Amino acid sequence: MSAVNPAGGDIAAGRSWPEVLNGLLDGRDQSADDTAWAMDRIMRGEATDAQIAGFLVALRAKGETVEEISGLVRAMYEHANLIEVPGATVDIVGTGGDGAKTVNISTMSSIVVAGTGAKVVKHGNRAASSASGSSDVLEKLGINLQLTPKRVAEVAEEAGITICFAVKFHPALRHVAAARGQLGIRTTFNVLGPLTNPARVKAQAVGVADPRMAPIVAGVFAERGNSSLVFRGDDGLDELTTTSTSRVWVVREGKVTEESFDPRDVGLDLVPVEALRGADAAYNADVARRLLNGETGPVRDAVLLNSAAALVALSPGAGTLAEQLRAGMAQAAEAIDSGAAKRALERWVAASNA
């Protein structure tokens, strides 16, 4: 399916790689249709590695805009295997790329949030900046990733949590793998994953490692009416971190508000990043099991905080951000301590292997 202008007509009309690339090199912001055209060519396999690399480097060098990213997202959705999951859904994810090699905080938080009764639809892949990616760890926990899109949606209804394994839902991304690998630098694709959840969830808690891109990601969410918390640790982590203060972009009703957050405001001590360090998938899965069995410490604190961020995004309440997060942390703690989070994982394992 070709990318289509909402006003009607094929967006490919009158565009070429030299036109788009020269515009970027001249420092001109591109329209959403321009970037959608480029992504459409890439997703079709009709762009060379040189054209893909040139586009990604030129776009990053100029500096991406909300409109440009929105165009890329639109075209990616045109080539994706999408699913429908009824009701209010939330995703907790980080862009990766912070190099910290932490345990899988967003993955553990997703299970805890499911334990509170919220419906979670993750969009995950192999390792980016964690010691192992969400998909790697979930496999070790017993989750079957090799499901059809239809079955993935059914699991969400049966277990209250599911994962869209990126390579199965965005198969056209294979066309960019070589160029991205050869470049070896951050590109726009580092932030597209959280923006292209195949279930098109309406609420997200998203960690963004790149300080340039965090407000852009928030702007894209605002443009499409999502309720989201976008954050970045001031030490560079793509989490709402307990290792430092963070910047938070609160997205509600089409507006973005930027705030500073200090974990000490919700009663948490600052810890060194080493306290959150992970290892391979087997080790990180064991950390998750211990968390769900009630182990306390820095990992639990970080998971409670990021679980709270998702709960606030899904159902914003009254009060300051810190007050809302504190309430969310209490919900998350109850999910762990009551065994509800552990039972959510057990349901998920059973449903994904049924």
From Swiss-Prot:
InterPro entries: Anthranilate_Pribosyl_Tfrase, Glycosyl_Trfase_fam3, Glycosyl_Trfase_fam3_N_dom, Glycosyl_Trfase_fam3_N_dom_sf, Nuc_phospho_transferase. 5-phospho-alpha-D-ribose 1-diphosphate binds at residues 94, 97-98, 102, 104-107, 122-130, 134. One of its GO terms (biological process) is L-tryptophan biosynthetic process. Its cofactor is Mg(2+). Anthranilate 1 binds at residues 94, 125. Mg(2+) 1 binds at residues 106, 239. Pathway: Amino-acid biosynthesis; L-tryptophan biosynthesis; L-tryptophan from chorismate: step 2/5. Anthranilate 2 binds at residue 180. The keyword S-adenosyl-L-methionine does not apply. GO terms for molecular function: anthranilate phosphoribosyltransferase activity; magnesium ion binding. Keywords: Amino-acid biosynthesis, Aromatic amino acid biosynthesis, Glycosyltransferase, Magnesium, Metal-binding, Transferase, Tryptophan biosynthesis. Signal peptide: none annotated. SUPFAM superfamilies: Nucleoside phosphorylase/phosphoribosyltransferase catalytic domain (SSF52418), Nucleoside phosphorylase/phosphoribosyltransferase N-terminal domain (SSF47648). Its EC number is 2.4.2.18. Binds 2 magnesium ions per monomer. Mg(2+) 2 binds at residues 238-239. It catalyses: N-(5-phospho-beta-D-ribosyl)anthranilate + diphosphate = 5-phospho-alpha-D-ribose 1-diphosphate + anthranilate. The keyword Cell cycle does not apply. Transmembrane segments: none annotated. Catalyzes the transfer of the phosphoribosyl group of 5-phosphorylribose-1-pyrophosphate (PRPP) to anthranilate to yield N-(5'-phosphoribosyl)-anthranilate (PRA). Homodimer. This is Anthranilate phosphoribosyltransferase.
